[in-house]
Amino acid sequence: MSKNLEGKKSPNFSGECTSETKFKLSELNKNLVLYFYPKDSTPGCTTESQDFRDLYKKFLKHDTEIIGVSRDSLKSHENFKSKQSLPFELLSDPDEKVCKAFDVIKLKSMYGRKYLGVDRSTFLINKDKKIIKEWRGVKVKGHADEVLDAVINLL
């Protein structure tokens, strides 16, 4: 069972991102949509990232930044970001420090084989670094719209 982080202070984290940037939550003066996804360039992850891309300007109007996180390498992230024209950065978490801080590593099963993977999850963090809303086990369809609604109604 995942720990519920809603209403709690966000874990402080930093990491290497696309565009040769380093992200530090402590230095962000905006709200943040932090979405975790299993793997670059896979169907669900591509659709989810495109949906956030298409709504990005609306998130910015509400002083909210978006960061995508997966265990993929920076090179993989750069290719994915470029191919999908993503206007926001992707954080590379190969050692799973950020994934573990948000408790999104789960035992999964595919074709009868069990493995540890990223549970598609999103966290809405306000300017005070408090987690206002969390979504775990996300279904991609309509998710970015639901997150935008939360930004509009909860922040």
Predicted segments — roles?
Residues 1-155:
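Chalcogenol-based redox active-site neighborhoods
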